[in-house]
């Protein structure tokens, strides 16, 4: 029998069954002696094997994760994505599950869109009747005459057109030498609603801080939900968190609409934000973990577009309802119907999470239901699918343990580096968005519609832009481009600040001034560009974070990233808290941080067409490709050819 010599290169990282078997047979020559390796193996065959290895390294892109997960080795274990295809779970059943995961995003978007209109300050003035003394509605000082009272009332009537709750003491409404409004306030109405909580409890002037407090608490509710509900999602499952939070959103929203004081409204709004964050986090995880690498971007953008549709839908519902309490019930009470998601076999748990947690029987049941949905009614699964399900534990080998301590997490520095960069990028992308306000963002109904439609429209355009470019140029490259455009828009707007506040404002404000019109057009253009690019950066940083965080800690890691994004939204209430003072300095700081993000993004790995990491070891291998050093043309084998004994000899 002719001897066989192993010429293959073992798979790195201790593949365990993933060794490339390139053994060749060495035949004896005519004189009975064994020839050389060059005589037995043709040069073309060795060159073909090297080309195949080079193609495998090229697909990996020099990335550690790509070399360990993307290289297809037949004897090795199947990935979860390959298991989905082998079982037949990709198809109509998968699309139905993804659709069920996208539907709750609509109500999350409705809840987010409600806060700006619920806290919008309506035009107001002090209620007064005719002009006899002490009947103007303002408190009269001790030494004021009746003539001064009438004159002051007329001045108040003229000044009432510009009053807002952001005035520190409503001095723009108060007549000279008068203190404060003794009677009720008259409100001229809101763009879409007749009244809101501000008009019901007169949260203006000295009580205006309660409105800003409500905005801050609502945002902190989202941040707390993202941060604290990530651990239960990793510990008890994604499905349970989604069902629990969806079931509580309805009672919380109805209770907030029935609250009898502003304090009760603020407390329930905080709880509502907490629950909506849990819904958003849970369904995002379930959508992402059910897709193969080619579907992840489309599914993520589909969820974002559903959210954009929710913002547009909210404007229509507000125009129909007119009352803020009825509108609150309308957007939250239907969430109680999501309790039907608890019906067995309808809304399924993440099979990827079940496999990582070693719940094999539950994972088999979920995969079987997904596969049966893709087949005609009554048709059995194929033999290959049945074998894959029965041998699931051996097909997808599990880690030694799925539990770990916090101290062990500190050893995975690469995971923490990716979390830090993406969290910082997401924070800046959300925080700087408030600085991009086009000219004319006042309190009139047309300005309100302009700002609302502009924010939603740029988000939709960002989704279209990402869908066209990301799969072609990669996640990291488009994220770098988005943050670069954000930084450019901020720097240009800061340069236009001096033109907006010139030395001679009287000459500048003249009607028909071409320089003034040109400046307003430039501010509007770069504001739209900044909104567009910051929306794209926020969407892509969240997706990239979900793709580099391992399944075992994906709920906690992604929750941290999304919580930082929610905290970035505090820049708006913080600026209103100081009545707009310091807006220029805030924009300067955020623009500098955006430039820092550009440098940090180059340290991130590329996840395009890569498998999701399952355990911490896989997440630690998510490293950036080399910027200067190219991968070698072939993988060098430093092991001597005959170093390993061959049992065939």
UniProtKB/Swiss-Prot annotation:
Q: Where is this region: Disordered?
A: 1-70
User: Which tissues and organs express this gene's product?
Assistant: Expressed in brain.
| Biased composition annotated in UniProt, kind: Basic and acidic residues | 47-57
Its induction note reads: Expression is activated by RUNX3. Repressed by the oncoprotein BCR-ABL; BCR-ABL misregulates expression by inducing a switch in binding from RUNX3 to RUNX1, a repressor of 24p3R expression, through a Ras signaling pathway.
User: Which GO annotations describe the biological process of this protein?
Assistant: intracellular iron ion homeostasis; siderophore transport
| Primary site of residence | membrane
| Keyword Protein biosynthesis belongs to the record | no
Short name of any one Pfam family annotated for the protein: Sugar_tr
Q: Point to the regions of Polar residues compositional bias.
A: 24-34
Q: Where in the cell is it found?
A: Cell membrane; Vacuole membrane
Glycosylated residues, per the record, are 134, 143
Q: Which UniProt keywords apply?
A: Cell membrane, Glycoprotein, Ion transport, Iron, Iron transport, Membrane, Receptor, Transmembrane, Transmembrane helix, Transport, Vacuole
* Disulfide bridge partners, by residue number: none
- Its membrane topology, per UniProt? Multi-pass membrane protein
A GO CC term assigned to this protein in UniProt:
organelle membrane
Superkingdom to which the source organism belongs:
Eukaryota
Stretches that traverse the bilayer:
211-231, 240-260, 265-285, 300-320, 330-350, 414-433, 448-468, 477-497, 526-546, 557-577, 584-604
Q: Which family does it belong to?
A: Belongs to the major facilitator (TC 2.A.1) superfamily. Organic cation transporter (TC 2.A.1.19) family.
PANTHER family in UniProt:
SOLUTE CARRIER FAMILY 22 MEMBER
Q: What does this protein do?
A: Cell surface receptor for LCN2 (24p3) that plays a key role in iron homeostasis and transport. Able to bind iron-bound LCN2 (holo-24p3), followed by internalization of holo-24p3 and release of iron, thereby increasing intracellular iron concentration and leading to inhibition of apoptosis. Also binds iron-free LCN2 (apo-24p3), followed by internalization of apo-24p3 and its association with an intracellular siderophore, leading to iron chelation and iron transfer to the extracellular medium, thereby reducing intracellular iron concentration and resulting in apoptosis.
Q: What is this protein called?
A: Solute carrier family 22 member 17
């Amino acid at each position: 029998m002719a001897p066989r010599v192993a010429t293959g290169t073992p798979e790195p990282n201790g593949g365990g069954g993933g060794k490339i078997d390139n053994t060749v047979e060495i035949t004896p020559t005519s004189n009975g002696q064994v020839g050389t390796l060059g005589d037995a193996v043709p040069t073309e065959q060795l060159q073909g094997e090297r080309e195949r290895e080079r193609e495998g390294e090229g697909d990996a892109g020099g990335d550690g994760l790509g070399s360990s997960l993307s290289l297809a080795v037949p004897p090795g274990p199947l990935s979860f994505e390959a298991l989905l295809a082998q079982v037949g779970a990709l198809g109509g059943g998968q699309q139905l599950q993804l659709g069920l995961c996208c539907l709750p995003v609509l109500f999350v978007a409705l809840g987010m869109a409600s806060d700006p209109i619920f806290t919008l300050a309506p035009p107001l003035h002090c209620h007064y009747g005719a002009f006899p003394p002490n009947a103007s509605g303002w408190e009269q000082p001790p030494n004021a005459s009746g003539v001064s009272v009438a004159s002051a009332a007329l001045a108040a009537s003229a000044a009432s057109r510009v009053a807002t709750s952001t005035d520190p003491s409503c001095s723009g409404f108060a007549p000279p030498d008068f203190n404060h409004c003794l009677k009720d306030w008259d409100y001229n109405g809101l763009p879409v609603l007749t009244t809101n909580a501000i008009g019901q409890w007169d949260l203006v002037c000295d009580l205006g801080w309660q409105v800003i407090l409500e905005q801050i608490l609502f945002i902190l509710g989202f941040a707390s939900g993202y941060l604290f509900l990530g651990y239960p999602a990793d510990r008890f499952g994604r499905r349970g968190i989604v069902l629990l939070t969806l079931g509580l959103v309805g009672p919380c929203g109805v209770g907030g609409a029935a609250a009898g004081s502003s304090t009760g409204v603020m407390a329930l709004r905080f709880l509502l934000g907490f629950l909506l964050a849990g819904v958003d986090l849970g369904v995002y995880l379930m959508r992402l973990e059910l897709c193969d690498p080619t579907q992840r971007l489309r599914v993520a953008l589909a969820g974002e577009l559903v959210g954009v549709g929710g913002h547009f839908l909210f404007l229509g519902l507000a125009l129909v309802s007119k009352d803020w309490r009825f509108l609150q019930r309308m957007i939250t009470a239907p969430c109680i119907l999501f309790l039907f998601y608890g019906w067995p076999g309808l809304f399924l748990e993440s099979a990827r999470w079940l496999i990582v947690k070693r719940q094999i029987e539950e994972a088999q049941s979920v995969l079987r239901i997904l596969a049966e949905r893709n087949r005609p009614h009554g048709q059995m699964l194929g033999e290959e699918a049945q074998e894959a399900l029965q041998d699931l534990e051996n097909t997808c080998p599990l880690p030694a343990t799925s539990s770990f301590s916090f101290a062990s997490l500190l050893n995975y520095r690469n995971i923490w580096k990716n979390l830090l960069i993406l969290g910082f990028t997401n924070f800046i992308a959300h925080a700087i968005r408030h600085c991009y306000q086009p000219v004319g963002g006042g309190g009139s109904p047309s300005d309100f519609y302009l700002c609302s439609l502009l924010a939603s429209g740029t988000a939709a355009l960002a989704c279209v832009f990402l869908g066209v470019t990301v799969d072609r140029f990669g996640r990291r490259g488009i994220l770098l481009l988005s943050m670069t455009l954000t930084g450019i828009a901020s720097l240009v707007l800061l340069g236009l600040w001096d033109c907006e506040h010139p030395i001679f404002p009287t000459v500048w404000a003249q009607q028909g001034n071409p320089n003034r019109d040109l400046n307003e057009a430039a501010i509007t253009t770069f504001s739209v560009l900044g909104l567009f690019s910051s929306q794209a950066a926020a969407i892509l940083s969240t997706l990239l974070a979900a793709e580099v965080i391992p399944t075992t800690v994906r709920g906690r890691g992604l929750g941290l990233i999304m919580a930082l994004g929610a905290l970035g939204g505090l820049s708006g209430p913080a600026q209103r808290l100081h009545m707009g003072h310091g807006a220029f300095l805030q924009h300067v700081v955020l623009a500098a941080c955006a430039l820092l993000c550009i440098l940090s993004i180059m340290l991130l790995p590329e996840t395009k067409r890569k498998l999701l990491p399952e355990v911490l070891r896989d997440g630690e291998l998510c490293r950036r490709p080399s910027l200067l050093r190219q991968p070698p043309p072939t993988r060098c084998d430093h092991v001597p050819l005959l170093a390993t004994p061959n049992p065939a000899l």
